[in-house]
């Protein structure tokens, strides 16, 4: 049976996503491998998450659909760049793997986890959340439709309960 990560990848394919900028992250590892293996998709490795916001906007200007993958700890790096999305009315979807919540061992992850949803909402980005495997595919599918059919701006938070807590 396909995993929830495969459901997300399948939603990308169905929606015609062809560019996937990302900062390497264990929470997105399976999805990133799938993107790299697909010749119709272009994975873009970033040095900082805010580059991904601009990359998604540029992809849209070039006639492509793009989704940004990042970890919650990188959301704070994007706040200023998100003004590009809202001021220019670009369609935008990011999928965020959460750290700093359910069973977190690393205290440095907690402050940004607490600020992630609020940071997006303050910048005019709608927030959706997936807590269980059966929510992932349908949530991403619905978000992709809203983003590219009506130029919405959405962040999907993949909870640490869904991804699995890290043990150190």
Which sequence ranges carry the predicted segments?
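Thiamine diphosphate
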Residues: 1-168
